[in-house]
Each structure stands twice: as C-alpha cells, then as structure tokens.
Amino acid sequence: MDDTLIYRKIEMEELKLELFRKFQRRQNVDRQLQKQGDAWVEQPVSLVEEWSKEDYEFLLTCLQDTIREGGVVFGAFEGNAVKGFASVSGNPLGYAGTYRDLTSLHVSRDMRGRGIGTRLFHLAAGWALAMGGQKLYIAANPAIESQLFDRALGCTDAQEPDEEHMKNAPKDRQLEYVL
C-alpha cells in the first residue's frame, strides 16, 4: 500500500484537464483474454493503450456525467494531481437493480503495483454497498494484467451481463463482485 497518497471523493468543480496533468495512461498489452465459444482463452497481441488529449476530454465528460447522475468519483492524490481514480454510476443495473456499475478504475503507469487500484476498488465497492447495491458490475479490459487484477480481488463472471456494455465494448469481460 502507498500511504503517501490522499484518497478522497473528487468533486465536480475539480474535473478539469489540469487534474490529470501528471496522470500516465499507458499500457503495453502483449496478452489478452478473448472469448472463444464458452471459454476465455489467452491470446498474444501487440498493442499500446494510451490516451490522447481528446480521450482525456471525453473522460472528463463521462466523470462529470457520473457525478451529475448521482454517482461518485474517488481519486488517489499526490499533492493536487490525481494518480488513480475510480467511478461508480448512481444508476442501478440488472433485472432487479442489484448491480452498481464500476465505470472506471485507472492507476497512472508510474504508480502501478503499489496497491492503489485495490484501495480505489474497495472505496468504490463500499460506496456501492452504501447505495443499496448487492454487486459491483465490471466491464473488464481484456488485457491479461487487468483480468488478473480483477480475479485477485474476487471478481467472477457476471450472472447478468449488461447488453449495453457488451455492445459498446465487445472484447471486455463482464464481471461482478459481490458486496
């Protein structure tokens, strides 16, 4: 665990590009889990996931919408720069509304491996439980590192896969975490 960071809610007025000036969203992906029939199979790939200024602007819009619609955004701060963040939608998912959607969870490249993602995940899960959720819904990036992270936390395949998530990101693995 990295105890030098401050973990707290991010308020609407803080959501500006400047907040992410020291955030490094880059991931070199050499292996992914891909759905083949009923099984998830590890496949070699070669790609780099990195955000542009336009990607950050889109992210800000999404995070602002999350707060506006009753959700929450948590951040891990080094000084006044965010080094990790997680967001949860305020809108219930699932047939009975038992899911709360973990809409983002990212840690800056220079800060990975320090327990920041785990701490943000648990903050998000605690909030989801307090809001009446029974499960956290995760549309997991297919990169093997992301999949291993989610599995280590206890996430399992979602019992009620969300159609919109599957349509928007067909390679993502639909997971849940029981609160």
Model-derived features with residue positions:
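Conserved GNAT acetyl-CoA-binding A-motif
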Residues: 128-141
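Acetyl-CoA-dependent GNAT
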Residues: 22-98, 103, 108, 178
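Conserved active-site tyrosine of GNAT-family acetyltransferases
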Residues: 149-151, 155
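DNA-contacting interfaces and partner/effector-binding or oligomerization modules
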Residues: 2-21, 25-30
